[in-house]
Amino acid sequence: MTVAEEIRVLRERMNLSQREISSMVGYCHRTIVRWEQGKSIPKTAVLQYLREISKKQNTGKVNGNPAFRFIDLFAGIGGMRLGFEMAGGKCVFTCEWNAEARKTYEANFPGDHRFAGDIREVRPEDVPPYDVLVAGFPCQPFSIAGVSKKNALGRPHGFLCETQGTLFFEVARLLEAHRPPVFILENVKNLVNHDKGNTFRVILGTLRDELGYSVHCRVIDAKGWVPQHRERIFIVGFRENAGFSFDNLEFPDTFRGPTLGSILHPEDGSELAESPYTMGEMATVSEKYTLSDRLWKYLQDYATKHQAKGNGFGFGLFGPKDVARTLSARYYKDGSEILIHRKEGNPRRLTPRECARLMGFDRPGQPFFRIPVSDTQAYKQFGNAVVVPVVETVAKGILPFLETETSETAPLFSRKTG
């Protein structure tokens, strides 16, 4: 391992940004960048200091004595897991059927427990003891885009969809079998209105009346945490009426949230180039993310046509001071919902790395979230994901309502008896 590689590894182990390392050792940020690029070498004393600090931090690693244990269903690429781990939890079981999503998940969470595929094949006895059931159950059957598409094709949707709609009931099956103290479910905002509200009524009826949980719901807009207008519904259930209320959680001001400048590649040499997203000494965004003349003309013509009809279809063009639209799983097709304005030439798409930042997977002072898949798959995966810091906030909000006994010998989990 070269000195440059060691410095980067040490920094990532400590979950620190280059600027934070700069403050720690008393050298300017540009010098830290040069160290990691191998263009200069730090003094031996500085390198030894970083080694010692990293060693001390890693002797008390998180999740060794977790505050609670949780299972991650319909796990996707691990956004719910990241948020719950940041709240002090430990994942003990994962279920995700999509091979590409699983590839990304396993690249970031090396296996230390069973990883199941099809949830319909999971038996209750296959799942280890846990305190919280976490599930972002498949959202497409209930999303506005998904319903419109299925209606146009004459296909069933929601709970009538044989491939995905009934998967909520697989969640209910495990809740009924295990009776965990708490569950948290996440879905698209349109779940509330789907099928004139009947779908949501069935879900709440199952959770409250059939399973006997105290259930609380809230639609949360992520733009207080990340520069993206993204509304999702969170459904939290407690086995006992614990007195929980979303009103007691502290959410950031949605009118004072971050802007896109906080997640865009700076292209000024202050970050290391990451192929294939950025390149060169200044780490400029690769030209492949710039729209071709043909695609840019098509998007402009398409927007003009629909504006004349009085509807809102069209591209979204944004700059560093803006907040973006919702990143969707179809972003890989043309990137039209979030295009980045450039001083010269056609606009560009976000890179997958910027998408990771936009969804809160990459945060200051933490190692890069690994993206081992193609751009097409990455766009789909981040578009289907949750915003990590939103999940973290909700997860921390339930902690006071969980029992505190969490030793290996006495987990909170209690199986159904009788």
Question: Where on the chain are the PLM-derived regions?
Answer:
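Core alpha/beta nucleotide-donor-binding catalytic domains of modification enzymes
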Residues: Q57-R179, K189-N193, N198
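Conserved hydrophobic/aromatic packing and binding residues within compact polymer-binding modules
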Residues: I7, I21-S22, I32-W35
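A short, Lys/Arg-rich alpha-helix, primarily the initiator
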Residues: M1-R13
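DNA major-groove recognition helix of helix-turn-helix/homeodomain DNA-binding modules
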Residues: P42-G60
